């Protein structure tokens, strides 16, 4: 069934939803908002007044979608319900990214269906079964000692520099090195991964506006396919060889599937973990008592609180394959539902004192790795380990780190990113504040 702007408007008017106190025309995926701040107060207003709210969008201003808008989902339990019902709420229909450039061509949205994030069963089930081989506790555990050594080196080199951009010198390095180690990518090529992922996700940011994200994606896929060809000729004891060989149940990834898997790793793995690290350090700078506690205790619970607090993916979307009632609100077939993880992770009905950064928080049922179900983050354990290792290294080598300037935010309607953050690693800089 096709939904145009008018038919969606009629369906929305027939559904009784409270009206929150928001500025006229407010759009929760507007990248201009996130370039300046997070809409913390607006999310709180929705959770209180209209947890499931129709976010209308004018034609031509829907970030690549021309359906009149979407349902904004702001409470944690609703996010989890949508995530559990992948038979009702499709990742494939419109993809999971809720915001692109307004003038993006529909075929450029649809091509992203080749990435596992944007698949439904049974194709998603098959791919995830194969790819999960690389993320077993044993596979991740084998990286621990090497990544611990690398984390210490990263922090020591940054500390020796005295000051600099925390994002480029610290945050991005270990996630990139973890991915490089997992895939067997030469460490000297990790800079390419960094730039390709920036260019693919920052297409609405002025810093990357001159770059064609399709070209960056094509370069990365080409790089990955060449790597797969090399491993096919010269097998090794690594995850790439396992993924492209039919050594388990006769299943393997095609060259195309492997290429798009690397795209997913570069974005979903690298971008999210590095933004968690940056915003975790920002949180420690704003909550020095928690930093003192971390330096003394190094609690395992810290990584999950950092991910909850940062929520590096602001939102993903699904599309309803049939009519569905969600917490009393009628979702119509064809309508998009955008799960705002950033709001859900501060749900007052789930978290005690949600606006308190508490690295001992336990339990911590956040959705920073996705709601639950088929699309829960396959690399969550690797991300936790990476976060723990880098903060241990920062605590060892630059325990008195202080900000020099305010962070520069990424202009994105779905990714909570920090592009640059100047810091003094010694804590002695007189202009630090």
UniProtKB/Swiss-Prot annotation:
It comes from Mycobacterium tuberculosis (strain ATCC 25618 / H37Rv). The keyword Calcium does not apply. The keyword Cytoplasm does not apply. This is Steroid C26-monooxygenase. It catalyses: cholest-4-en-3-one + 6 reduced [2Fe-2S]-[ferredoxin] + 3 O2 + 5 H(+) = (25S)-3-oxocholest-4-en-26-oate + 6 oxidized [2Fe-2S]-[ferredoxin] + 4 H2O; (25R)-3-oxocholest-4-en-26-ol + 2 reduced [2Fe-2S]-[ferredoxin] + O2 + 2 H(+) = (25R)-3-oxocholest-4-en-26-al + 2 oxidized [2Fe-2S]-[ferredoxin] + 2 H2O; (25R)-3-oxocholest-4-en-26-al + 2 reduced [2Fe-2S]-[ferredoxin] + O2 + H(+) = (25R)-3-oxocholest-4-en-26-oate + 2 oxidized [2Fe-2S]-[ferredoxin] + H2O; cholest-4-en-3-one + 2 reduced [2Fe-2S]-[ferredoxin] + O2 + 2 H(+) = (25S)-3-oxocholest-4-en-26-ol + 2 oxidized [2Fe-2S]-[ferredoxin] + H2O. Disruption phenotype: Cells lacking this gene appear to metabolize cholesterol normally, probably due to the ability of Cyp142 to compensate for loss of Cyp125. Involved in the utilization of cholesterol as the sole carbon and energy source by degrading the side chain during infection. Primarily catalyzes the sequential oxidation of the terminal methyl of cholest-4-en-3-one into (25S)-26-hydroxycholest-4-en-3-one (alcohol), (25S)-26-oxocholest-4-en-3-one (aldehyde), to finally yield the carboxylic acid (25S)-3-oxocholest-4-en-26-oate. Also able to sequentially oxidize cholesterol itself, not only cholest-4-en-3-one. Induction: By cholesterol. The gene is cyp125.
